Every structure is written in structure tokens, then in C-alpha cells.
Amino acid sequence: MTIPDPILRILTLARWAPSGDNCQPWKFEVVNASHIVVHGSDTREWCLYDFDGHASHIAHGALIETIRIAASAEDLSISWKRRNNTAETSAIYDIHFQPEAGLPDDPLLPFIESRVVQRRMMKRHPLSNEQKRALADAAAPSLEVVFLETGSDKSNIAKLLWRSAYVRLTCPEAYDVHREVIEWNARFSNDKIPEEAVGVDPMTAKLMRWVMQ
């Protein structure tokens, strides 16, 4: 069948949805002009980080939310449901589109294609009260943003992250994942992490590539 233009435009944007290691654990099936099916998968068999497929499940949710945002540009709202009796490793989601005249574009629509990853050091100066309010207001009403600002709080978080990194970087299973998911000498990648997004300097990148041979 010929894919209707609005659905094609929505899916063209939806493929920008974030996923762990940019693995994009999904496939699209267009049923008709108002119904698509997302065939989800996960990477638990080979990716240490995808414990019980939860990371992929989060990616499925990010995809559905991106579809919702993209659909707003077509004056379409969505409803979705996961099919019953589908395996956790191959979840299937039915997504239906409903016309909604005058539906405003979602404020996040312009940012779908400008999605970036920041793994480098950020500025060290404290957030302003206005910035804190903006972050708090961006969360859903049922969520709370907690700011850890004291020296002891930041020290405790740093220790926790260091211990987590030590486990990841000394675990053979994680080594295999890192070797497979990085695309070296690349700024962009279709289905991996490009080297420039890893967040290391050129010399460290060369060392990493040599170690991971």
C-alpha cells in the first residue's frame, strides 16, 4: 500500500526518537491512514545495560511520545495500547490517529530533529532560581525535581557514579557492548554512537579504539 503523506511525515520524524546506544529497537507497520503498529524488540540478549529489556521499553515510550509530538503538526492526536499476550521481548503497540482541528503544534516539535547528546563537562556555576523553576515546571505534575547542591550531596553522587562506572568499565560483558556500539571517526551514525558523541578528547578516543580491538 502507499503510505499516506501525513503518516509518512510523522514516521520520518518519529525515527529520531532516542534509544539506548541509538539501537532503535522497533519496526513500523502501516495498517491504514489512521492506524500504525509498532513492533518493539529489545537487546537484553547481548546488551548488559538492557536488563530485562527495561531500557528498550523506555525507548518504546520515547518513540510513542515522539509520534504524539510529530502528529500534532498534522492536526492529529493519538491513542495507543500495547497488545495483550505479547512477549516482553517483542512488545507490539497499536497506535491510532484521530483528526483534531485546530490542534496546536506541540512546543517540542521543533526539537525532534535537533536532538543532541551532551557527555562533556558542563559549567560549574549554580543554576539560577529561574532556571530551577523552568526545570521543575517541565516535569509532569506527579513528578518532583530534586536539586542536589551542597558539597556533600555532590560528593556522594560523584562517588556513586564513579563506582557505577568502575563496574561498567571492568565488566567483560560491558566491554563487548562498548566495542559494538561505537562508530569510530564519525560525527553522526545511523544506528550506533558516533565517536564525537562519546565525550572524550581525540587522543583518548584513539586509545579507546586500540583497546577495544
PLM-predicted stretches and their roles:
Residues 1-213:
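Acidic, surface-exposed loops and disordered segments
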